[in-house]
Regions:
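Acidic/glycine-enriched edge-of-secondary-structure segments
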Residues: 38-52, 92-93, 181-183, 244
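Conserved beta-ketoacyl condensing-enzyme motif
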Residues: 45-95, 200-221, 227
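Stable alpha-helical structural segments in soluble proteins, enriched in small hydrophobic residues
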Residues: 46-62, 99, 103, 107, ...
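Claisen-condensing/thiolase-fold acyl-transfer catalytic domains that form or cleave C-C bonds
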Residues: 76-77, 86-115, 135-137, 151, ...
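Membrane-interface helix-loop-helix junctions at boundaries between adjacent transmembrane segments
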Residues: 114-117, 130
């Protein structure tokens, strides 16, 4: 059985209102109103440099058992893991808001091949205030760290699936026609990603107890509930008012927080899905096994 022996996150307790962020970025009241309509209220932002927080998070990992490291970043920036041991490191980037799923796919296959523990580090930060605020949404800070193993697995990875078809390749500066094409096709492409992932392991959508999605705003998941014919209350977005979106890592935070709050129980099968603007998508299906952290 392969999966996460340990999966943990570090999210700031410092919550900044979207009013403060919109004012700092000199954005309009219309944009603020759209953010509120999408369910956003506060965004978690580290007061310290995220690299310092990363070191604190990594201090909880026993590196003597780690034989490989995958670093997943949508927008790459230099980080120093300050390792005492020599451990092979692979860094992947791109696929904004979906890269963590590719990191899991890579790390899981690596673990299966060498039968040794692999560390996944998923970390992103906005390089400026205008990069934090994006298309009526706002990005919060988080660090996700997981140890993939075939021993003492707590979160069994059943399947991962990543795909891309890029409609708008320059973000909010893309041609308006490309942006509109992306928005028209996005719900169906998210559904296709989910269905293809389920097919890999011969599951149906009704086998999934909860969907934990990317959370730029609520409206996309109101639509997806209808597109998937899946209960909206089982598409878990209740924490969005204190997270906004967390790049590729928000679905994992929502999942782990739901475990902490007793919503997810042993044996539950969940689907975590991230849809990036422009045309990248990733999803991971997990069975919660429970056990030691």
């Amino acid at each position: 059985m392969n999966g996460f022996r340990k999966l943990l996150y570090k999210i700031p307790s410092n919550l900044v209102t979207i009013e403060t962020l919109v004012k700092e970025a000199n954005l309009s009241n219309d944009i603020l109103a759209n953010m509120k309509k999408g369910g956003l209220k506060h965004i978690p932002i580290f007061k310290e440099k995220i690299e310092i927080i990363l070191q604190q998070t990594l201090s909880k990992i026993d590196f003597s058992k780690i034989k490989g490291i995958v670093i997943a970043q949508s927008v790459p920036f230099k980080i120093d893991l300050k390792l005492e041991q020599k451990i092979p490191i692979t860094t992947i980037s791109g696929q904004p808001c979906a890269i963590t799923h590719l990191g899991i796919e890579l790390a899981n296959e690596w673990q299966k091949n060498i039968k040794q523990d692999i560390l996944l580090v998923a970390i992103d930060k906005p390089l400026s205030i205008d990069k934090r605020l994006y298309f009526n949404s706002a990005m919060g800070d988080i660090i996700l760290v997981g140890v993939l193993s075939n021993k003492n697995v707590k979160h069994k990875i059943l399947s991962s699936y990543v795909d891309s078809y890029i409609f708008a390749d320059n973000g909010e500066y893309s041609d308006i026609q490309d942006i509109n094409r992306f928005r028209e096709n996005n719900p169906l492409l998210i559904r296709e990603n989910i269905i293809n992932n389920l097919k890999k392991i011969d599951l149906e959508l009704n086998d999934i107890d909860y969907i934990f999605p990317h959370t730029p705003y609520l409206q996309i998941w109101d639509i997806m509930a209808k597109v998937l014919n899946y209960p909206r209350e089982q598409i878990f977005t209740k924490y969005i008012n204190k997270t906004g979106h967390l790049n590729s890592n928000d679905s994992f935070f929502h999942y782990l927080k739901a475990i902490e709050n007793g919503i997810i129980t042993k044996g539950n099968k969940v689907l975590l899905v991230n849809n990036g603007f422009g045309g990248s998508r990733g999803s991971t299906i997990i069975e919660y096994i429970g056990g030691q952290k």
